[in-house]
């Protein structure tokens, strides 16, 4: 899904952090797949904007093109490959100087992408969103501080069920050539900048990531990692900020939302308020 109306959510663009202040890098995004993947695209666009990049909806105007891919089913994989090849044409015969491939297809075919599509300059997996800055040729901007004291929560890496299944090899990716051995564990929070690509009145909030159930028919745990929840206060803080920005419809999403909070040890009554 190409980026539509872009709205900075949470933090201003810091132009001084751009290593090329005379002409900001123009970055174009193509986001494929589910709303959860769209949130990942919004996070990467937020990080790029904070670093001084200029986002564009026109691939022909972009210096850097990012394709955030899906590989849940075979048809999604093919759509991702076709889109990468389409965007590669803007590099070989157009203005673009860099082509970055991100998302689930990278987790499954990391080495094969770079081997078979030499136009690809960098890949960014689902657990590596913050690497989008170096992948796009930008230096990271200083992270904003949120002024919070230490969190009243202890966050476990995953649910005990997920840890037990991992110990049994149920999440193994050893058979995937080029796959990173460790499962993705990235999880954005309310301090992470986002650029909304949804209509102005609505937004998604990803409250959790990953899944602990390695069903035979599903590849999500290998692509997204074990289940992990965001802190309750973090979700509320993001919702409040979105509301202040004019959002009136918020959809909470995750691979397994019914398990939200199972991996959090609460030491406050915030969830009951």
Describe the predicted segments one by one:
Residues 1-261:
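Proteins enriched for Cys/Gly/acidic motifs involved in redox and nucleic-acid/cofactor modification
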């Amino acid at each position: 899904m190409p980026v539509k109306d872009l709205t900075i959510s949470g933090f201003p663009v810091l132009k001084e952090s751009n290593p090329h202040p005379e002409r900001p890098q123009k970055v174009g995004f193509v986001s494929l797949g589910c709303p959860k993947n769209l949130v990942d695209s919004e996070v990467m666009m937020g990080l790029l904007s904070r670093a001084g990049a200029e986002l564009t909806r026109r691939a022909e105007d972009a210096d850097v093109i990012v394709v955030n891919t899906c590989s849940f089913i075979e048809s999604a994989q093919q759509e991702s490959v076709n889109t990468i090849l389409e965007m590669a044409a803007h590099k070989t015969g157009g203005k673009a100087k860099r082509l970055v491939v991100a998302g689930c297809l990278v987790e499954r075919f990391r080495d094969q992408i770079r081997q078979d599509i030499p136009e690809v300059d960098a890949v960014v997996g689902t657990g590596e969103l913050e690497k989008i800055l170096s992948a796009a040729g930008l230096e990271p901007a200083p992270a904003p501080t949120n002024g919070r004291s230490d969190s009243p929560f202890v966050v476990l890496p995953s649910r005990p069920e997920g840890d037990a299944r991992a110990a049994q090899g149920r999440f193994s990716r050893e058979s995937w050539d080029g796959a990173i051995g460790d499962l993705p564990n990235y999880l954005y929070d309310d301090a992470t900048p986002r650029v909304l690509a949804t209509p102005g009145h609505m937004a998604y909030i990803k409250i959790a990531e990953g899944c602990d159930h390695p069903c035979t028919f599903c590849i999500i745990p290998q692509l997204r990692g074990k289940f992990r929840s965001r802190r309750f206060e973090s979700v509320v803080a993001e919702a409040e900020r979105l509301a202040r920005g004019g959002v009136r419809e918020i959809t909470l999403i995750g691979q397994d939302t019914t398990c939200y909070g199972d991996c959090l040890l609460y030491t406050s009554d915030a969830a009951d308020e």
